A protein has these predicted regions:
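Anion-binding and metal-coordination hotspots
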Residues: 67-69, 82-87, 146-174
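Structural motif
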Residues: 21-22, 134-145
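Hydrophobic (often cysteine-bearing) scaffold residues that line and stabilize catalytic clefts
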Residues: 51, 113, 142, 146
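Polybasic low-complexity intrinsically disordered regions
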Residues: 1-96, 149
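Helix-centered, glycine/charged polyanion-binding patches within enzymatic domains
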Residues: 67, 72-139
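Short, solvent-exposed polar/charged micro-motifs at secondary-structure junctions
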Residues: 1-2, 101-102, 144-145
Length: 174
């Protein structure tokens, strides 16, 4: 295959990155959602940018406080300290080679509900059509992405986590 003919539109902007699904060329959409599935913040980076980098950007997390749940890719002592100073507690699973640390039961339960973010990603791609491989300009790419995010925000039913604190030591999930 002749790769020189590929990726001309974004040749100076898009990069190649690796995800759990393999290699891809383009960009990454980073989103922060709340328990009701509403998008609080989003950021677009090149494909080769570390997933932790947007979390270091103050403007990306300005609407966020409290607990932030992420996957193992967000594990970083430095990032944990940086966010903690800003009033954000980063909660992730531990990697296999790490020491087990104590975690509140409610945090453990909520960490298992991370599939909600995957559902949001799926709805953005399949219902709101943000994943598109044939854009002919950066402007069209960004217009389509922002329109898709706006359309998602107007969806009547979003993936969510229904829970309430019964008292200081109990958590109810529905």
């Amino acid at each position: 295959k002749n790769n020189k003919k590929r990726n001309k539109v974004f040749k100076d902007v898009a990069t190649t990155g690796k995800s759990t699904m393999g290699w891809f060329h383009g960009f990454k959409l980073h989103i922060v959602i709340n328990d009701r599935g509403e998008i609080l913040s989003f950021c677009v980076t090149q494909a080769n940018v570390d997933d932790r980098e947007p979390l270091k950007n103050e403007s990306f997390l300005k609407a966020v406080f409290g607990k932030l749940f992420g996957d193992k890719g967000y594990i970083s002592k430095e990032l944990h300290k940086l966010l903690f100073v800003d009033g954000i507690e980063l909660i992730t699973n531990i990697k296999n080679n790490m020491k087990n640390s104590l975690m509140l039961l409610s945090d453990k339960i909520l960490l298992r509900k991370r599939s909600v973010i995957e559902t949001v990603n799926d709805e953005l791609k399949n219902i709101c059509q943000v994943e598109h491989s044939r854009h002919r300009s950066v402007t069209n790419f960004l217009s389509n992405l922002i329109a898709g995010i706006i359309a998602y925000q107007f969806l009547p039913k979003k993936p969510s986590i229904k829970f309430e604190h019964l008292n200081s030591s109990q958590l109810a999930l529905y």
